[in-house]
């Protein structure tokens, strides 16, 4: 499974562009239905694979949010985060009959009765879903892990506190991520702006970042960390934002163009 995930993630550098739109679904699963939820996503995995082949969307990823069972704040977090990527607004708003597509995918592979039962299960496994639509503003170049090296996924939501925030991310913090990437610590960083959200979603978050770090690598210290100018940039950059969402995740399913 690990090798399969790594082979999939290698394609990120080719499949992700600056102009991409991404929908986030933060999902809370009904108690006792975790295995059913995984079964549902396994069904959808083949459907999404076909959707990507049919140019309905660019990518689909399901992440499981890691939680500390002894931490009350962690227990409030979603159980899963699903990401659907699109080339542009035209692709995102393309009308799709998902049931017809699923029937096409499973024709000859699953009986009609079994298909209907699986299809009807989809809405029952979710207790709550909160949605965001974001636009990719910037990212680093993909730095593939070594064979067998695992990856750690960190998903952060920030509230911009002043008009300088986006510049700090793209003109200062990005350089930091690039240096960590060149040093072999980091595989990927992306910066996304919230365009819209559901009414039940967090109303404070304005931007999201995704950091993908390589496991079992030494900590990286910026070469300018002792300089006063660098320290002031860090201080003011941090002051331009407030982190309101912070999740560490494990990738469960993924398909890319």
Task: Please identify what each model-predicted range represents.
Residues 1-22:
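Bacterial Sec-dependent N-terminal signal peptides
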């Amino acid at each position: 499974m690990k090798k399969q995930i790594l082979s999939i993630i290698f394609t990120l550098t080719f499949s992700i562009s600056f102009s991409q739109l991404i929908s986030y679904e933060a999902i809370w699963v009904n108690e006792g239905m975790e295995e059913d939820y995984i079964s549902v996503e396994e069904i959808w995995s083949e459907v999404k694979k076909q959707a990507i082949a049919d140019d309905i969307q660019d990518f689909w990823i399901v992440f499981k949010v890691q939680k500390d069972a002894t931490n009350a704040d962690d227990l409030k977090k979603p159980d899963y985060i699903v990401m659907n990527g699109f080339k542009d607004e035209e692709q995102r708003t393309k009308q799709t009959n998902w049931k017809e597509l699923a029937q096409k995918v499973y024709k000859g592979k699953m009986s009609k009765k079994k298909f209907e039962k699986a299809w009807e299960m989809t809405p029952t496994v979710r207790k709550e879903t909160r949605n965001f639509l974001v636009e990719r503003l910037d990212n680093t170049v993909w730095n593939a892990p070594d064979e067998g090296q695992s990856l750690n996924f960190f998903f952060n939501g920030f509230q911009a506190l002043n008009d300088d925030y986006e510049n700090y991310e793209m003109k200062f913090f990005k350089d930091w991520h690039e240096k960590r990437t060149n040093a072999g610590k980091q595989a990927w960083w992306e910066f996304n702006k919230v365009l819209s959200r559901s009414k039940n979603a967090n109303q404070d978050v304005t931007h999201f970042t995704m950091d993908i770090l390589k496991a079992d690598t030494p900590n990286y210290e910026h070469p300018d960390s002792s300089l006063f100018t660098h320290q002031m940039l860090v201080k003011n950059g941090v002051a331009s934002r407030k982190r309101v969402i912070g999740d560490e995740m494990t990738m469960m399913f993924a398909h890319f163009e």
